[in-house]
Amino acid sequence: MANFVLKAEKREDLGTGASRRLRRAGKIPAVIYGGEKEAVSVLLDHDKVLHSTEDKAFFSSEITLDIDGKQEKVIIKALQRHPYKVKLIHADFMRV
């Protein structure tokens, strides 16, 4: 079983315009939800996530997100892709 660790940063700017700027800068907006905690908006490096998705185990394995130095165990619930480009648009993670 593969061990997936991704670095993430908390997002302060929310909304469509902010998300577009992040995507142009090579980042993916994402949200982490579930459990007793509030939902958290984060951003991930596009190329690292895209590389991880090439392994089919990514979609069924527990993923460790390193959010500003704090570890969080999650699974991926949704991954939005661009219709014809090899680009990721958004990711949803659920806490384990």
UniProtKB/Swiss-Prot annotation:
Q: Which cysteines are joined by disulfide bonds?
A: none
User: Which Pfam family, any one, appears in the UniProt record?
Assistant: Ribosomal_L25p
- Work out whether the entry's keyword set contains Ribonucleoprotein: yes
Q: Which Gene3D superfamilies match?
A: Ribosomal Protein L25, Chain P (2.40.240.10)
Which domain of life does the UniProt lineage start with?
Bacteria
Q: Which UniProt keywords apply?
A: Ribonucleoprotein, Ribosomal protein, RNA-binding, rRNA-binding
Question: Can you provide one Gene Ontology molecular function annotated for this UniProt record?
Answer: 5S rRNA binding
What InterPro entries does the record tag this protein with? Rbsml_bL25/Gln-tRNA_synth_N (IPR020056), Ribosomal_bL25/Gln-tRNA_synth (IPR011035), Ribosomal_bL25_long (IPR001021), Ribosomal_bL25_short (IPR020055), Ribosomal_L25_dom (IPR029751), Ribosomal_uL5_bac-type (IPR020930)
Q: Name one GO cellular component term.
A: cytosolic large ribosomal subunit
A GO BP term here is: translation
Q: How does it assemble?
A: Part of the 50S ribosomal subunit; part of the 5S rRNA/L5/L18/L25 subcomplex. Contacts the 5S rRNA. Binds to the 5S rRNA independently of L5 and L18.
Function summary: This is one of the proteins that binds to the 5S RNA in the ribosome where it forms part of the central protuberance.
Instruction: Tell me its family.
Output: Belongs to the bacterial ribosomal protein bL25 family.
Name recorded for this polypeptide: Large ribosomal subunit protein bL25
| Species per Swiss-Prot/TrEMBL record | Francisella tularensis subsp. tularensis (strain SCHU S4 / Schu 4)
The taxonomy runs: Bacteria, Pseudomonadati, Pseudomonadota, Gammaproteobacteria, Thiotrichales
